[in-house]
Amino acid sequence: MESKIYFLNKISLFSVCGLMAGSIAPVLAATKSVPTVAGKKVIGLQIYSLGKELTENVPAGMKKIKEIGYSTIELAGYGNRKMGQYEVSEYRKIVEDAGLKITSAHVNPPERKYTSENTTKISDWWKQTVEDHVKLGVGRLIQPGMPTIENHDDVKLVCEVFNNAGEITKAAGMKWGYHNHNMEFKRIAKPGETLPTGPGAILRPTGDVVYDLMVDGTNPDLVFFEMDVYWTVMGQMDPLDYLEKYPKRIQVLHIKDRSVLGQSGMMNFENIFKKAYTNGISEFYVELEKVKANMTQFEGVKGCFDYLNTAAFVK
């Protein structure tokens, strides 16, 4: 039987190349599920999943999130020192009145290209952002956007900026982290090296993986990582490999699939959760970007909750 690592890597290759079809799904072993009482498990939601369906009526939307069964939320949408149309303290009250707890937030600095000339500007932005998120009661600030990285010098500067953001955040009693997509798993050439190109280049990996350089180049006391397991697979990597390689640095997960959790057949969530629990990871957030036709985002996030709430492998 194929190892879980080889299997996940093969599935991700099919997915990226656009070759994956429904016939692949039966290859996955059936996951045993047992019914549980809704809301007994602590399941978090990244509110980006809901888009306008939430922002059009935040108070009603937050209550709906709670009714579905979610316990915690991870914020998105901070800008100009506000959460959408709301002052941060007002937004926090809306969330808490709905019976939810804000435990994390995604925020991106205004600069994507880091230079020696704009690092002070970025640092000042983090200082005011931290101040606002203290008012929101957030325990973690997470950057989900990858800065421009083309070479090792770029990585070095990015890591310095990340460490600085971590220092600012730590001083306020919070933690600072980074969230990946697929781009972080690209490779950059080592000095004197040329990366392979053309057909089959992906089968001849060389160079350094940006994600690894980020983890290895940042201070463990200042920077943690929130792994998006779906985007890791889409980056041609196996989440299990990284959970094994960086058991202390990866502290939070984004649980995501191509659409509603468990429907694509391409994500081995059972093994991912088992390894996460072994590593001591207990917090995760559902993220849903796309739903099928004739389904609302709220219906989609409910489907995700139901999948996790009835899965025997989720504590």
Enumerate the language-model features and the residues they cover.
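N-terminal pre-domain/capping segments
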Residues: E2-S3, L8-F14, A21, A25-G139, ...
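Histidine-acidic metal/acid-base catalytic patches
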Residues: L28-G44, G51-K66, D208-M227, W231-K315
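Acidic-and-aromatic substrate-binding clefts and catalytic sites of carbohydrate-active enzymes
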Residues: L50-E56, A76-E87, P109-S123, P147-K156, ...
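Short amphipathic alpha-helices and their capping/turn segments at secondary-structure boundaries
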Residues: E87-E96, T129-V134, N163-E167, L240-K245, ...
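Short, hinge-like loop/turn segments at secondary-structure boundaries
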Residues: E90-K93, K121-I122, C159-E160, T194-T197, ...
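A short helix->loop->beta-strand "cap" motif at the edges of active sites that frequently abuts
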Residues: L100, V138-G139, M174, N279-E283
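Active-site acidic/histidine proton-transfer and metal-coordination neighborhood
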Residues: T115-F224, F298
